[in-house]
Amino acid sequence: MSSTGKFELLCLENPLLDIQGTGDEKLLQKYGLKPNDAILAEKQHMDLYQELMEKHDAKLIAGGAAQNTARGAQYCLPPDSVIYIGCVGKDEHAKTLEKANKEAGLKTCYRYDEEQPTGRCGVVITGHNR
């Protein structure tokens, strides 16, 4: 993880892949969710991610507060001004995050976990509710 560049901003946090799909009250009830709420996913919520992608026209969006901040800052600052550090799984979701950061010109240093998947955030959009 050595770098020859001089970065003005370091962002460090767990990266997330936001999986945003349009659902309804029935989907919320299936997983014990409420509109406009946020929870830490438990075992009974794990199938939601795949269901959003397969049945609810999900969009995959690079997320996580620090990673979003890093991409936004890199947009405003000169090239190679921002570096982001986080941990992801060795999976396709990590590749999605890497691609988004590369497109934003963001230098990214990920640690790859062989056992745990990349962090995900399931978002069920119902009308104006998230």
Positions of PLM-derived features:
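Short catalytic-loop micro-motif centered on adjacent basic/acidic residues
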Residues: 83-86, 109-110
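Short, electropositive alpha-helical surface patch
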Residues: 86, 90, 94-103
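Glycine-rich phosphate/adenosyl-contacting loop at the front of the ribokinase-like
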Residues: 2-83, 92-95
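Short, hinge-like loop/turn segments at secondary-structure boundaries
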Residues: 28-29, 100-103, 126-130
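A glycine-rich helix N-cap at a beta->alpha junction
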Residues: 100-117
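Short beta-strand/turn micro-motifs composed of small residues
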Residues: 13, 86-88, 126
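Conserved phosphate-binding/catalytic loop of the ribokinase/pfkB sugar-kinase fold
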Residues: 109-113, 121-130
